[in-house]
């Protein structure tokens, strides 16, 4: 009986870890692909640019001052 409980615990632990890993990978992918005009605007303002637009999933800063 003890052996069956141990095997069940190991299997459930492995399943839980695989689910958590899949969720984390999906979350990280969404974060790296995240792009919105508001996010780009504030990101580009930090770099002293007047505008920031989301184009093709990437932030594009416009009207930047280089000093």
Swiss-Prot record:
Sorted UniProt keywords: Cleavage on pair of basic residues, Disulfide bond, Ion channel impairing toxin, Neurotoxin, Potassium channel impairing toxin, Secreted, Signal, Toxin
Signal peptide annotation: 1-25
Propeptide positions: 26-31
Tissues where the protein occurs: Expressed by the venom gland.
Organism: Hoffmannihadrurus gertschi
Family statement drawn from the similarity comment of this UniProt entry: Belongs to the short scorpion toxin superfamily. Potassium channel inhibitor family.
Localisation: Secreted
Tagged with keyword Membrane: no
Cysteine disulfide links: 35-54, 40-59, 44-61, 49-64
Role description: Blocks Kv1.1/KCNA1, Kv1.2/KCNA2 and Kv1.3/KCNA3 voltage-gated potassium channels.
Superkingdom of the organism of origin: Eukaryota
Molecular-function annotations in GO: potassium channel regulator activity; toxin activity
GO cellular component terms, A-Z: extracellular region
Protein name per its UniProtKB record: Potassium channel toxin alpha-KTx
């Amino acid at each position: 009986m003890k052996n069956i409980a141990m095997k069940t615990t190991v299997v459930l632990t492995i399943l839980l870890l695989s689910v958590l890993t899949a969720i984390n990978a999906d979350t990280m992918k969404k974060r790296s692909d995240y792009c919105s005009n508001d996010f780009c605007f504030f990101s580009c303002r930090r770099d002293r640019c007047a505008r920031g637009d989301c184009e093709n999933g990437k932030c594009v800063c416009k009207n930047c001052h280089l000093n």
